[in-house]
């Protein structure tokens, strides 16, 4: 069975160095209309004893820019709890 091609995102750090991430999944919360994305660093494979590092962001599509999104930090405990619940559900599948 062929492995599904993952979306990749480049995120620059505070020094301007670019880091490549694989998209784990995206979801939108109907009640708030906010969208979230979960990413893992490229090249970091999940081992038997070690879990892959997962980064979560709120995102918005940039108007007029195809395949371009703006990432925002998750700021509230309620958002973190919801993202964690979604990740746990995704991990169980």
Swiss-Prot record:
This is UPF0473 protein BH1270. InterPro entries: UPF0473. Belongs to the UPF0473 family. Pfam families: DUF1292. HAMAP family: UPF0473 (MF_01448). It comes from Halalkalibacterium halodurans (strain ATCC BAA-125 / DSM 18197 / FERM 7344 / JCM 9153 / C-125) (Bacillus halodurans). Transmembrane segments: none annotated. PANTHER family: UPF0473 PROTEIN CBO2561/CLC_2432 (PTHR40066), UPF0473 PROTEIN CBO2561_CLC_2432 (PTHR40066:SF1).
